[in-house]
Amino acid sequence: MDSGDATSLLLTKIRSLEPDYAPKIIGYLLLHDFGDRDLMHLARGPESILQSTISKVKSLLGIFSNNSPSSTPTSPSPLNPICRPPLNGRGSSHSNGFMDFRRNSPSSPSSTSPWSFNNCINGNNGNNPHISPKHTPISKPFSSHQSNGLSATHSGSADAAGGADLLDDQQLNDCLSFLDDSCSKTEDLVDPSIPLDYSVDGDGETHLHRRSFSCDASFVSGDDGFGGGCKPCVYFSRGLCKNGESCKFIHGGYPDNMDGNGIVADSPRKMENFVRQHEEMMRLKLAYQQQRLASQILGRAPQLPYEKRMDFLLQQHAQRDGGLPFGDERFWSSSPGRLERMELAMHLGDQSNSASRQIYLTFPADSTFKDEDVATYFSLFGTVQDVRIPYQQKRMFGFVSFAHPETVKVVLARGNPHFICDSRVLVKPYKEKGKVLDKKQQQLLQQQIERGNYSPCSSPSGIDPREQSDFHLGSKMLYERREMMRRKIEQADLLRAIELERRRFINLQLPEFKNSVTLNHHRSFSVGSPGYFSSAGNQSPDFQSELNGADALKVTDDTLELHPYPVVNPMSVNNSYSNGAKEETNKSELLDPDSGSTIELVLPSNLFPSASSTDDHKTDDSAETNAKVGVSSTNENDHEPPVTTNNLMQ
């Protein structure tokens, strides 16, 4: 309820009772912080309560009625708004919200008795012997509030001249019981001589500070950790308070951490998360614009199913931002560079989108139709948004913008010519200058669309050197669930095929070919099958003589068991040696254990020639043969037959 209504209503009622002193009485009540609820109770309560209160205030102010003779006070009343009563013992009179005054009576000029507004409500007085001593002036609050008001002293005996008491304490307790609906009967927990609203400064003086009877003193004083003020800070709820910790309002927010508009106000971290979500939505919107631009350039379908969902998502986001009390651009004041780039890219995207909704007109210079005529004609195909024809004497071109790109396709499919006001009009598709990409850029853009790599920057290459550290929007955010699953399956199949190919190369074994001199000759050099040589053939002649027959036979047999390759026929070797011992290369036959057929093998005449004999006997053919074959042979100078199993056994 408005405080002005309660005050004016109470003032009107007091004027009806005390027309001369009504301003003083209402001013006294307002100076001592009577709450709106208290004033309204007095204004709408019984008239006896108001008369008792008026009499009490008049006694405090030292105002007496003309029909009631009163004794002249020996000393003026020390009622002063700036008076500060000293904080002494219990014998001294102290006030909780009101100034002390002393009223001298003829019978006892110096006798005083402390009383408070609490005593009036509780029905006790300083000189009343029937009141329990454990109840003190500050022990009973008003409706769970600590009562700190209207304390004064008055005479303990009746006024001799008046013939009656000014106010009966018990009667005042009954009359003002509405102020003590939920009065507690607890014992004192603090020193009764120290009022709750007293504050002591460095000089030991007390200060009176009380806001209202209807306001909780503990909440006002900041005992709950807010530091002052019962109202939340509006600037903090919007994200920033320039006063910081020194702000007199609460930086805590409403219940459930929400303010009146539903915005999180007490958690800067949550506000940062909200800003981050907003930034991600801006990136998503920018990527969507670039995707639509690429689709229009390459002549793809105008709208896919996920694009409709993106339109709905962006529309919901725009509606949510429009409902904010501080607008959409407030978050981006700290990052103008990024915001400008995004706005520029979106503006370019909007322009490109508008290009698909426009057509180019050519007509004779002597045409007389107006913009309205063009709009009326093309409205037959669809909604016309704008018509632009230059204001020239000889005009020959113009532009028409439609609300939907599909209308442009319908107009172009209609063909030429069109007749507007008997003028021949030709329609052509609208193309922006400087927007045509070269073939390389179109291929790159097509690859990005197929792979789903959409960059948030506005460059066609997808590279922004000024913002390389920013993350790019993932491709899977723009695809449906089935498309994502298909891509995952394809990726898994590709990885599986790569793994199988890698294992095949590691364990590569070439198949055996029969009756092929060349393949059997190069078998030992294939991948995965190293070449094996006979132990007896690699030994020197001196070491061979030291071996006895049994040892040599054992070595040869072990070699044959480990490596079942075609074995050299000893008889063929001896025959070849006897027939062509002087030749540089000897030809011997290989015996294939499986088929029993013989394979002709070219053997070098000398594997380790001397330095002098190399120049004389080494030719191009022998050098090529020595590089391909690694089988041991006999020395050329001695012309000894090669060591075989038959020779060792002899």
From Swiss-Prot:
Swiss-Prot/TrEMBL keywords: DNA-binding, Metal-binding, RNA-binding, Zinc, Zinc-finger
Chain positions covered by the region annotation Disordered: 67-162, 566-650
CDD domains cross-referenced by the UniProt entry: RRM_AtC3H46_like
GO molecular function ontology, one term from the record: zinc ion binding
SUPFAM superfamilies, per the entry: RNA-binding domain, RBD
Zinc finger annotations (C3H1-type) as residue ranges: 232-254
Listed Polar residues bias regions: 141-154
Domain RRM: from-to ranges: 357-433
Top-rank taxon, per record: Eukaryota
Compositional bias of kind Low complexity: 105-128
UniProt-listed Pfam families: PABC_AtC3H46, RRM_1, zf-CCCH
InterPro entries linked to this entry: AtC3H46-like_PABC-like, AtC3H46-like_RRM, Nucleotide-bd_a/b_plait_sf, RBD_domain_sf, RRM_dom, Znf_CCCH
PANTHER family, sorted: RNA-BINDING (RRM/RBD/RNP MOTIFS) (PTHR24009), ZINC FINGER CCCH DOMAIN-CONTAINING PROTEIN 55 (PTHR24009:SF41)
Protein name, per record: Zinc finger CCCH domain-containing protein 55
